[in-house]
Amino acid sequence: LLHLDVDVLIPAALADSVTGKSAVGIRAKIIVEGANAPTTPEGDAILNDKKILVVPDILANSGGVIVSYFEWVQDKQNYFWSADEVKQNLNDIMMKSFREVEHMATDKNISWREAAHMIGVARVAEAHRLRGLYP
């Protein structure tokens, strides 16, 4: 399946399914990582060399974690949103995140995975700067 002639490939089941060996035969133009860690570092390097856009797992499959956070916030406030509000808030956050990663990748001429990691590290560093070391 990984080697089918498709526009978008979504590895969404297993970690390490896109390896150095399997990446060589991938013909998709875009890979959206639905699974956690579906691409090995060797596979990632080959995909980058082939100029295949990879939307990394930490961006592509973060919707579930975001909605879990929404549930926590609603429970804490005892104020519950409609399904449409949840979808709109999720869409807003996901689109903002996609734009940030795309901008960083383009601006720095790096992969989307590197951009997503850079943004994540910067956010943690800023939180640490503002709040101090959290136990």
Regions found by a protein language model. Give the residues of each.
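Adenosine-phosphate binding glycine-rich loop
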Residues: 12, 24-135
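A structured beta-alpha segment of the ubiquitous adenosine-cofactor-binding alpha/beta core
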Residues: 1-22
